[in-house]
Amino acid sequence: MANNYSNSNVKNKVLFKSFNYNSEYFSVGLNDGFKIFKTHPLSLTVDRKLNGGIGIIEMLNESNIFCLVGGGSNPKYKLNKLLIWDDSKCKNIKEFRFNSFVKNCKIKLKKIFIVCEDSISIIEIENFDILETIQTIENPNGICSISKNPNEYLFAWPDFIKGRIEIKNYKYFIRESINKNKLIKKVHESCIEQIELNYNGDLIATASDKGTIIRVFNTQNLNLLNEFRRGNTDAKIYSICFDTNNKFLAVASDKQKIHIFSLEEEKKNKGYFNAFSKVVGLGEILNRSVCFLMDEENVKKKISFFGNSLISINYNGNFTFGNCFLNNKFKNIKKNSIFN
């Protein structure tokens, strides 16, 4: 692929983007099908033309199995359907229909989590049985998160009550104990905008629709561990991610910056920061990003860590890959377009 950065091909605007569990690959849904890329070095591995738009795509680990949902101005499939696609056969192997539009999905080795407008369905892959259906608050953006570790099944979503989240462990699911292994807590005063579990599912980061404060909780009891201030003005939070070592948290917003927060520095400086913040009238919050990456395009994006690097893909198909945390600055920043 050519190493240039362009958004001139607007007709190829990305409809959806997602990383697999270890960020080795990412998937994009397009107006005419979908593509799969290897993250580093950036290379195209799958290019499927389907004569219709794919609005949601999720890869199972590093396999040829994908979840597909239609999208765009000419959807390939009805928006209330989810298809299981086997790319080794280039065909669908299973189809699910729902009473409302599918807004998001997460696929693991044993289970699929399908988020509709006002419900979540958990499906067992072995026999495609529906294990549980959860009625939820209206969730037009499909807000949810799942632990990326293939052996863990912690799943999180917004609760019925504004500002609350629910977390449940589906690793050992028993039909007779639906409400066991579930935690509920109010984490913001306003509506939930983003939630993100770390790799092993022992931490969760949250942001509200105000976008000023990012909070990190442990998932054992939802005790608050960290609070970070992204800024003083409201912002739309596009994406949140942890690095695999739980040293850093990245936050992308519509303020043309991707902030990096140090979880380790926050722990070391917590006493000092809290004391100082009380003096200057900021309550318990003063911790700011240790570095940030300027974003030339104010376009919705998805971010993920890959080793010591941060990856950003936006809806124009532009891809940024940068080594970070070297003297609190980004180094070796590379930009590309998935349409080249």
Question: Residue ranges of each PLM-predicted region?
Answer:
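Canonical WD40 repeat/beta-propeller blade segments in eukaryotic WD-repeat proteins
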Residues: N9-S18, G53-E58, S100-K106, T136-K148, ...
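Beta-propeller domains
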Residues: N22-L50, I65, V69-S88
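Beta-strand-rich domains and repeat architectures in extracellular enzymes and scaffolds
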Residues: N3-K35, N51-N64
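Hydrophobic beta-strand positions that form the internal "hydrophobic ladder"
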Residues: F26, F66, I112, F155, ...
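Asp-box/WD-like beta-propeller blade repeats and closely related beta-sheet repeat scaffolds
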Residues: K89-N149
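Terminal intrinsically disordered, low-complexity extensions flanking WD-repeat/beta-propeller proteins
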Residues: K13, G33, R48-G55, M59-E62, ...
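Per-blade loop-tip surfaces of WD-repeat and WD-like beta-propellers in eukaryotic adaptors/scaffolds
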Residues: F37-T45, K81-K91, S119-I137, P158-I192, ...
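Conserved loop/turn motif of beta-propeller repeat scaffolds
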Residues: N22-S23, S63, L109-K111, P150-E152, ...
